[in-house]
Every structure is written in structure tokens, then in C-alpha cells.
Amino acid sequence: MNAILDGFRRLADFKGRDRRSRFWPYALTVVGLSFVGLWLGMIPAMTAIFEQASAVAATHPEAATVISGPGHYSVEIHDEAFMPDMGPFFLVLRIGVAAIVILLAAAVTRRLHDTGRAGYWGLPPVIFLTICLTAFPTVMARLMAEEGPDMSLFMLLFLNNFLYIASLIGLIILLSLGSKTTANRYGPPAI
């Protein structure tokens, strides 16, 4: 519990070192709470999207196809003018991701310092994730609006997401490495 509270107290402390036993309880708590928060934030955003799609199907049946069955209900909208507003969904997603990055930035930096690495090693996943969250709405809007869409942007986004996952796995490996037992340029060994 002390490791978790210490992580929250040191949100803006990018100096020094943190052992694995201090970092992981805090990081997993932040990720867990963030997923719960994102889930709770997504409920109203997704509900609004479903309500908009159902309203289009009811008022403009020529612009939508409804398929329903036991445990299944879907609405496919054929006219771009009637597409639900995805803005709130992406806003909640962006706020949630920003919160995770802010809450973990200093702790990741201190953990990397403990392994003898600069905090900059934590940036590649953030960069690739930012590209995805910025480009995804535009790419999806283009794919849904075009007859025979240009898939090159989608493939670039797919490559970006692959690089994000690879860089995230690499960062997790770095964060899992053992501590340097001697003092390094970031300070004495963490207690």
C-alpha cells in the first residue's frame, strides 16, 4: 500500500530511482483504475452512439439496415450524413489515455533510472499511441465515407499500431529488469 501511495505523492518527481517492488504495485493500480474509469466514461458515450443509430434506423429506414436476433442487434448506416457522432467516444478515450500517461510518467522515469536508463526510453509508446489517437478518427471517417476506400492510410495506421505494441512490450521488458545495485548518474540505489 505504501508503494501505491508513494507513487501518487511523487507524480511530478522525475528524479531519483524506484525499485520494481515500488513501481509495479503503483503502475498496476493506475492501469486498473484507469480501465475502470474508461469503462465508466465509455458507457454514456457508447449509449449515445447506439441511440443515434437506432433513431436513424427508425426515422430513415432507407438509410440503415437493422439486423437483430437472440442476443444480437446491429444497425448499419449507409448514408454518411446520418452517421452517429463519434466525438464523445474519442474524447473519453483521449482523456483516459492522457490520465494514464500523466499518472505513470514520473514513475516510469524513476524505474528506468533504477536500471541505468534515461526516462526518454518511455516516450516511444506515448508517441505511437498519440499518433493513433489523432489519426484513427480521420482514417475511419474516410474509410466509411468512400466507395472503394484508399487503404493506404489504414495500412499506415496499422503499421503505427504494430510499432506501438512493439515499443510497449520493449518498455515493459526494460521496466522489469533488475535494479543497478550501485549508484548511477540518477542517484544511489532506491531503498
Give the ranges of each region predicted by the language model.
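Membrane-helix exit/interface motif
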Residues: 40-44, 100-110
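Central hydrophobic cores of alpha-helical transmembrane segments
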Residues: 120-130
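Membrane-helix interface segments in multi-pass membrane proteins
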Residues: 37-97, 128-167
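Hydrophobic alpha-helical transmembrane segments in multi-pass membrane proteins
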Residues: 30, 34-38, 122, 134
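Terminal transmembrane helical module of multi-pass membrane proteins
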Residues: 149-191
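Hydrophobic alpha-helical transmembrane segments
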Residues: 25-31, 91-104
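Hydrophobic core positions of alpha-helical segments in small-molecule transporters
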Residues: 26-29, 123-125, 162
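Membrane-interface extramembranous regions at the lipid-water interface
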Residues: 1-33, 106-119, 173-191
